[in-house]
Amino acid sequence: MDLDLKEGRSRPSLLSSFLTPRAAAASPAILTVLLIPGLVIVAAFFLIPLARVAVEVGNGPEGWGTYLLILTNARYLESLIQTLAMSAGVTMMALVLCAVVGLFLVRNRFAGRSILIGTLTLPLSFPGTVVGFMVIMLAGRQGVIGGLTDAAFGSKLVFAYDIAGLFIGYLYFSIPRVILAVMASAEKLDLQLEEAARSLGASRFRVICDVILPGLMPGLISSGAICFATAMGAFGTAFTLATDIDVLPMVIYTEFTRNANIPVAAALSIVLGLITWACLAAVRSFTGEGKSLPVRGGA
C-alpha cells in the first residue's frame, strides 16, 4: 500500500497540481491547452461575427461613410439620443431607489424580509417580453390603471406604449441588477465609522454624505454601469412596448428585418457595442479594477 495512504495523507490531484502558480510558471503549455476551449468559444461566437458585422458596413453603398450617415441622419441620431437619455435616466432612478431600499433591507430585520428581497430580484428570471407584458397589464388599454381611471373618471389612462411605459419596464428589470450590488456593499459598511461621525457632531445628512455614500460608491458605480449597458441593448421590452419610440435596438431590428438595410444595421450595432463597451471600460478604469494593490505583510 502507498505510504501516503498509510499515513492518512491524500495525494494532490493531477488537475490541482496543474493549477498551482509554480506549475503554471513551469508549464506554459498547460495553460495554453486549458485556454483553447475558451478561445474557440470567444472566436466562434464573438470575434468572427463581429468581424463579419464590420465587413458588412463597408459593403454598403456608402462604404465606410455609413458611420457618418448614422450620425447625421435625423432618425438615427434621434434614436441614439433617445436611447442614451432613456438608459441614463433609468440608471439614475434605479441607483437612487436601490440605494435607499438596499440599505434599509440590510440594516433591518422584519417578517417577510426574505420574501421582499425575493420579489425585488424576481425580474432577473423574466425575459424582456414578459416584463413588457406586465407593464401592459398595468398601464395598457386593458390594464389595472386604465380600469380604475375608467371607473373613477370615465376615461382610461393608458401610458404603457409611450416613453413612460418603456421607462417603467426598463426600471423594473434594472432594479435586481442594482439592488444586489448595493446590498453587498451595505453589508461591508463599518458602523463604528458612523458612530464616530455622530459623536463628533455630524448630522444625519453629513453621515450619509461623508460615510455611507462613499462606502456604497463602488457598488453603485459598478451596478450603474451594468444597468446602463443593459438598458442600452434591451430589446424584448422595447419590442413589446415601443410602438412609437425608436430606441436603438428597435431601429437595428427594423433596418435588418423589414428594410433589409444590412450595412446601416451593422453600423448601428457597432456604435451600440462601442458605447456600452466604453461605459464598462470607463467604470473599470475609475474603480481601479485590474490594478495591483499593495499587500501588507503580517505574521
What are these language model-derived features?
Residues 17-30, 67-76, 238-284, 289:
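Interhelical loop and adjacent transmembrane-helix boundary motif
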Residues 45-53, 178, 219-254:
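Non-cytoplasmic
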Residues 66, 89-120, 133, 137, ...:
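Transmembrane-helix boundary motif in ABC transporter permease subunits
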Residues 32-33, 45-49, 183-198, 210-211, ...:
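C-terminal transmembrane helix and the adjacent membrane-cytosol boundary/short C-terminal tail
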